[in-house]
A protein has these predicted regions:
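Conserved, well-ordered alpha-helix/loop/beta-strand core segments that scaffold catalytic motifs
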Residues: 1-74
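C-terminal regions of proteins
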Residues: 54, 60-117
């Protein structure tokens, strides 16, 4: 049985440091590329069945809002379809093998290559 829990409140201090880091990078002409890493399809299915994953959606919403005020590029590779990955290429629910890692790197280059210097 899965236990339910409420989402933790965002750490405002961590956000402050994160946003200051992005501002510093932007001041130096750099656009950070932020990659939301994949979750195994089976785990995503269970999360959906049990109405879990709110933190990830909060992260997406936060980064989408931040894109409006800062120069960042966000790539959401939560699903394996988003980067051409394979379900068999996970060590567990969230850790990808070298083969999926290579696919993620290829997708990052294709979708955000102009920011990689």
């Amino acid at each position: 049985m899965l236990h339910t829990r409420t989402s933790a409140a965002p750490d405002t201090r961590a956000r402050e440091y994160f946003e200051k880091t992005i501002a510093l990078l932007n001041e130096h002409g750099t656009t950070p590329v932020i990659v939301i890493m994949p979750i195994h399809p089976r785990v995503l299915r269970v999360m959906k069945e049990h109405d879990m994953g709110g933190e990830r959606q909060q992260l997406r919403d936060y980064l989408a809002a931040l894109e409006q005020t800062a120069s960042i590029k966000v790539l959401d590779f939560t699903t394996i379809r988003s980067f051409g990955g394979e379900a068999d290429w996970f060590y567990d629910g969230v850790h990808i093998t070298r083969r999926n890692t290579n696919r993620v790197i290829t997708a990052v280059k294709a979708k955000a290559g102009e920011y990689l210097k």
